Amino acid sequence: MHAALVPTWSSPCPIYTEIPDPGPPPPEQLQLKVLAVGIPRVVRLRARGIHPTAKSASLPYDPSIDGVGIDEQTGIMYYILPLSASCLAEKVNVDRDNLVPLQPGAPKPQPRNGPENGYGIALGDAADHRAETLDPIAIAGLVNPVSSSWMALRTRVDGEITGKTVLVLGATSKSGRAAVLVARFLGANKVIGVARREEGLRSVEGLDGWVTSGDMLPGETGVRFALPDWVGPVHIVLDYVGGSVAAGVLGSAEIEEGRELQYVQVGNLALELGTGEKHMFETLPGHLISRKPICIRGSGMGSFSRRDLVREMPGLVAFLARMKAPFGIASAPMCEVASVWQDEDTKGSRVVIVP
């Protein structure tokens, strides 16, 4: 069968190649035909060997993190949980515990703000989607960016989201755009976006307001980002950027009396982009967390469990099936993986590989 593998760490992308079939699965596994594999930023970092999850990988290497597949015997479609299989292949054997069925019979998710949210998405029958009504390409393209904020808000934040003000730092990124919609769906009263460019912020659906972080360059002295007074009290910060802007947000955010500011670092674009930015903790004044009621957490596999992810998947998939994608999704056959990986025309979209 065919697969897409990274041959060397100096290679810019995976190459289309042939590998042996996986063979019959043991009883604890299912063999799936892979339908779609998303290529988010983390997969590109893994392909270059610079993501922590790729540090001990051996070559040739499949950098995928998750995917959508179908059991050809039953017709049931499954989401393959992160880091549980090499998905850039035509077929894959996966432990049953690492599969979430995209079919009727899953527990119905309960929205935090009633049976229907402000965007008209009703969840009363959310899990009653038959596999054939779900678009595997859309699920594969959306699940990573949407799950980042969904899991952060559902498992890494104390208390309800309903009525809170959520600030999304990095709101113009794909995950940031999704985070705005997720926060809205889960009941946030106000969502504020922060990013470098006003033009990009104007195109983010669901914001109540935005703040531009400007062109703060590493090494500048006497320059510090601060939130304007009109933002008002902030309850939750979802940070996809990190760096000095994140430190500025924590230092300047107004905190409602008797409440705590909950900061969750989901990504760290400032470091990943190689701009020379320091980590937020290097720029955060040491006295700040003793003088302001701030709770600092991270979000990702490890900070929440695989069991948490399995529990949240029915609600997450129901939301994915109904949401309007906040960015373009560009699919390509796996035989074109090398060209689409480096194609400038796909940079504004989420690439999904179809084996």
UniProtKB/Swiss-Prot annotation:
Gene Ontology molecular functions: oxidoreductase activity
Please provide the Gene Ontology terms (biological process) for this protein: secondary metabolite biosynthetic process; terrequinone A biosynthetic process
Function description: Probable NADPH-dependent quinone reductase; part of the gene cluster that mediates the biosynthesis of terrequinone A, an antitumor agent. The first step in the biosynthetic pathway for terrequinone A is formation of indole pyruvic acid (IPA) from L-tryptophan by the aminotransferase tdiD. The nonribosomal peptide synthase tdiA then immediately converts unstable IPA to didemethylasterriquinone D (DDAQ D), via condensation of 2 IPA molecules. The symmetric connectivity of the 2 IPA molecules is thought to arise by head-to-tail dual Claisen condensations facilitated by the TE domain.
UniProt lists the family membership as follows:
Belongs to the zinc-containing alcohol dehydrogenase family.
In the induction comment, the record states: Expressed during both sexual and asexual development. Expression is positively regulated by the secondary metabolism regulator laeA.
**Which PANTHER family would you find in this protein's record?**
SHORT-CHAIN DEHYDROGENASE/REDUCTASE (PTHR43677), ZINC-CONTAINING ALCOHOL DEHYDROGENASE (PTHR43677:SF11)
Keywords attached to this entry:
NADP, Oxidoreductase
Q: Which cofactor does it need?
A: NADPH
Annotated pathway, please? Secondary metabolite biosynthesis
Q: Which organism is it from?
A: Emericella nidulans (strain FGSC A4 / ATCC 38163 / CBS 112.46 / NRRL 194 / M139)
Supply the name of the protein. Answer: Probable NADPH-dependent quinone reductase tdiC
**Out of the domains of life, which is the source?**
Eukaryota
State the EC number(s). Answer: 1.1.1.-
InterPro entries, from UniProt? GroES-like_sf, NAD(P)-bd_dom_sf, Zn-ADH-like_protein
According to its UniProt record, this protein's enzyme class is oxidoreductase
